[in-house]
């Protein structure tokens, strides 16, 4: 009787079987030329979606030039291009100083949350986790609440925005506490232990936040506006503050795409393939957390982006992180820009919090994925 050759478990041939929650192996891979052409097509589609979202976001607003003139004005301000856009200096200032910072910040936040969500789902082999799993959101919310409830007088004279700074520090600190607690109970050997530690730490941070709000009811509205997510009032200073963290995080996660594919076959198999599981997991979690903490500090808590966007991308291109990370970045950035536009228009002139808009879109879509068993 002839022995059956075991199937290879290389990262390139791992796929997700929709019938069971376990990786299976594909025996046939696309030819290199076909694969490269397919990847190029999807990346160009993602770029087109993002650029289109930027144009829409910059063109819509209660004041300023007519929407159709905004793309011409943007082109007119590019090097070596001269177009008579018909946009006055005052109108251009509205576009450049008010709309564009908001659009760019929305793109950065959406891109970072989507990439971090995809990375968390890969490193923990769990399609239901998001960037807030280990406490970045709860810690950021606690930090912002602490500043808003203790009074601005305490932080008067700080060279940085106190809410953003403390939210960022608390987001990182909470994840560090989660990792320390998880490590003391065996998280180095089992990623599920780290997830459970995250649940405990998040619950504790949320309890402290609730206690502070109960004792300071006069700032509840301001705190909830922050918690529900907002991009209003975004400035180029916010963009400059966040960009370095997002760039570093995305670059690190892009460099670890192959490792994320290896994680999908299990820790033991990853070790067999030469991956240092503990070290690589720590690097990926640290990079995703750094970027998440940075964007949370300026935008508040915006849910479902890091959970749903990676699933949508998987349905389009498959589960390989070779494409999943860059496409999550492009589609996530474009999605959040459009969600912000919707929030501005739904109850104009008032604004709907962007976190509410993403929940309106994300929750039904995720229920659809669960119903059709397409959570991959």
Q: What residue spans do the PLM features occupy?
A:
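Alpha-helical transmembrane segments in inner-membrane proteins
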Residues: 2-376
């Amino acid at each position: 009787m002839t022995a059956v050759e075991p199937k290879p478990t290389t990262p390139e041939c791992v796929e997700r079987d929709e019938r069971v929650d376990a990786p299976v192996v594909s025996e046939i891979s696309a030819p290199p030329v076909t694969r490269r052409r397919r990847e190029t097509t999807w990346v160009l589609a993602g770029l087109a979606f993002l650029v289109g979202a930027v144009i829409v976001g910059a063109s819509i607003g209660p004041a300023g030039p007519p929407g159709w003139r905004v793309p011409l004005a943007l082109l007119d301000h590019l090097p070596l291009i001269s177009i008579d856009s018909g946009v006055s200096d005052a109108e251009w200032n509205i576009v450049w100083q008010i709309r564009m910072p908001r659009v760019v910040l929305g793109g950065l936040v959406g891109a970072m949350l989507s990439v971090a969500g995809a990375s968390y789902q890969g490193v923990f082999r769990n399609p239901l986790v998001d960037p807030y799993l280990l406490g970045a959101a709860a810690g950021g919310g606690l930090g912002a609440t602490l500043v808003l409830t203790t009074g601005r007088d305490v932080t008067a004279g700080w060279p940085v925005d106190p809410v953003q700074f403390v939210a960022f520090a608390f987001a990182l600190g909470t994840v560090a506490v989660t990792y320390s607690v998880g490590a003391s109970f065996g998280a180095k050997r089992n990623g599920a232990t780290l997830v459970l530690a995250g649940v405990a730490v998040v619950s504790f941070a949320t309890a402290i936040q609730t206690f502070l709000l109960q004792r300071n009811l006069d700032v509840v509205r301001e705190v909830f506006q922050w918690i529900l997510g907002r991009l209003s009032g975004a400035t180029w200073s916010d963009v400059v503050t966040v960009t370095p963290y997002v760039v570093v995080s995305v670059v690190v996660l892009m460099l670890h795409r192959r490792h994320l594919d290896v994680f999908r076959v299990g820790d033991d198999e990853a070790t067999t393939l030469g991956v240092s599981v503990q070290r690589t997991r720590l690097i990926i979690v640290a990079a995703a957390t750094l970027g998440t903490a940075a964007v949370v500090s300026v935008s508040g808590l915006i849910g479902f982006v890091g959970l749903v966007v990676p699933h949508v991308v998987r349905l389009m291109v498959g589960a390989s992180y070779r494409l999943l990370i860059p496409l999550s970045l492009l589609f996530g950035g474009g999605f959040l820009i459009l969600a912000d536009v919707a929030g501005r228009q739904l109850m104009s002139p008032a604004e709907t919090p962007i976190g509410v808009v993403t929940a309106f879109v994300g929750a039904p879509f995720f229920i659809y994925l669960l119903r059709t068993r397409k959570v991959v």
